[in-house]
């Protein structure tokens, strides 16, 4: 009897921890860690290894905190959508209050920790990122305009700037150039996602581009934003921050991305191919 109870407690405890981990949007968090680490590594100044690791952990926690607050606010929408109905709050694994407390607490800890292990500029930029994602994107824009992805993309584009500021205690045009690359990539990627998740967004009454402007215009906007990446991708080279070892592969990859987006656009009018959309 005791053994059975012990096993049950272990399983429940593990499930509880897993629920909080999923609340932090681990996929998004991993992308944030990666882009922040890139910003940190390409910066001209270096910090010691332990500070770099603790700083990245703080940024990861900040990203997770923003994700938790997003799920807290959008739990009503998440329960309506196939893509999100298995998240911790809709499934009852966590309550809204637990998500709110966790999100606020983690936000504070992450910003304070980043200030301790790096500097005020990095910590302030992280704070701005969290606040922008939660209040500007989640609360204000997402339910009101199809431009939610464009403006809200500012938050998702800031991690390289944070990484750069961790190492240099500054924000430069070089770090902003990498911010712009992610900023112009974001709309095309997420509008492609919204094409094949349109039914989900319709259920939740989220005004994504395919629902407000139609499939054809969405495909056009995807192509336009992918083409805008070409001049932006050249910026690090144009400001003498990077050399040809960056420029040539970057241009080749961007042209390939342009081709993928054009392939999606060139499909049947007012229709799209699922495989082509998923490639974007």
Give short role names for the model-derived ranges.
Residues 258-280:
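Interfacial loop-to-transmembrane junctions
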Residues 76, 132-145, 190, 196, ...:
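C-terminal ends of transmembrane helices
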Residues 36-43, 110-117, 133, 137-138, ...:
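Structural signal for membrane-spanning alpha-helices in multi-pass inner-membrane proteins
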Residues 2-15, 73-94, 191-218:
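Cytosolic, membrane-interface loops and tails of multi-pass inner-membrane proteins
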Residues 34-37, 87-90, 150-167, 216-217, ...:
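Small-residue-rich segments of transmembrane alpha-helices in multi-pass membrane proteins
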């Amino acid at each position: 009897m005791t053994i059975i109870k012990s096993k049950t407690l272990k399983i429940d405890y593990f499930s509880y921890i897993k629920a909080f981990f999923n609340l932090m949007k681990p996929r998004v968090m991993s992308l944030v860690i990666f882009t922040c680490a890139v910003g940190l590594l390409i910066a001209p100044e270096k910090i010691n290894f332990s500070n770099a690791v603790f700083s990245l952990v703080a940024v990861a926690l900040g990203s997770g905190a923003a994700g938790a607050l997003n799920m807290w606010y959008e739990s009503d929408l998440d329960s309506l959508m196939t893509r999100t109905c298995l998240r911790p709050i809709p499934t009852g694994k966590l309550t809204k209050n637990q998500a709110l407390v966790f999100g606020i607490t983690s936000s504070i800890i992450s910003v304070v920790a980043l200030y301790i292990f790096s500097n005020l500029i990095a910590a302030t930029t992280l704070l701005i990122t969290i606040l922008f994602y939660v209040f500007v994107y989640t609360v204000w824009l997402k339910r009101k305009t199809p431009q939610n992805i464009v403006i809200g993309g500012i938050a998702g584009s800031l991690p390289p700037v944070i990484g750069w500021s961790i190492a240099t205690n500054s924000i430069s045009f070089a770090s902003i150039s990498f911010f712009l690359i992610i900023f112009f990539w974001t709309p095309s990627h997420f509008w492609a996602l919204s094409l094949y998740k349109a039914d989900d967004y319709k259920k939740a009454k989220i005004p994504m581009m395919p629902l407000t402007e139609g499939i054809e215009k969405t495909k056009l906007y995807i192509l336009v934003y992918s083409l805008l990446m070409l001049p932006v991708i050249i910026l690090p080279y144009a400001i003498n921050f990077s050399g040809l070892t960056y420029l040539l592969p970057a241009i080749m990859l961007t042209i390939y991305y342009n081709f993928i987006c054009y392939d999606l656009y060139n499909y049947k009018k007012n229709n799209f191919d699922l495989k082509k959309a998923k490639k974007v």
